[in-house]
Amino acid sequence: RGVCSTPEGSCVHNGCICQNAPCCHESGCNWANVCPGFLWDKN
């Protein structure tokens, strides 16, 4: 599931990286456009 334990409070979920704390949720990552700093991890 989602991982929200990074020092920056970022969320990593199935290849998606939300660099903003509000993007991080207990169930995973916020996939909506309302999340600023939404990036795709091509790796």
From Swiss-Prot:
Keywords, sorted A to Z: Bromination, Disulfide bond, Hydroxylation, Ion channel impairing toxin, Neurotoxin, Secreted, Toxin
Superkingdom assignment: Eukaryota
Tissue specificity statement from the Swiss-Prot or TrEMBL entry: Expressed by the venom duct.
Residues cleaved off as propeptide: 1
Disulfide bonds: C4-C16, C11-C24, C18-C29, C23-C35
Keyword Lipid metabolism: no
Residue positions, PTM 6'-bromotryptophan: W31, W40
Disulfide bond among keywords: yes
Compartments it resides in: Secreted
Gene Ontology cellular component list: extracellular region
Gene Ontology molecular-function annotations: ion channel regulator activity; toxin activity
Positions where 4-hydroxyproline occurs in the chain: P36
Entry domain remark: The cysteine framework is XII (C-C-C-C-CC-C-C).
Record's function text: Mu-conotoxins block voltage-gated sodium channels. This toxin reversibly blocks voltage-gated sodium channel in cephalopods, with no alteration in the voltage dependence of sodium conductance or on the kinetics of inactivation.
Protein name (record): Mu-conotoxin-like CalTx 12.2.1E
Record organism: Californiconus californicus (California cone)
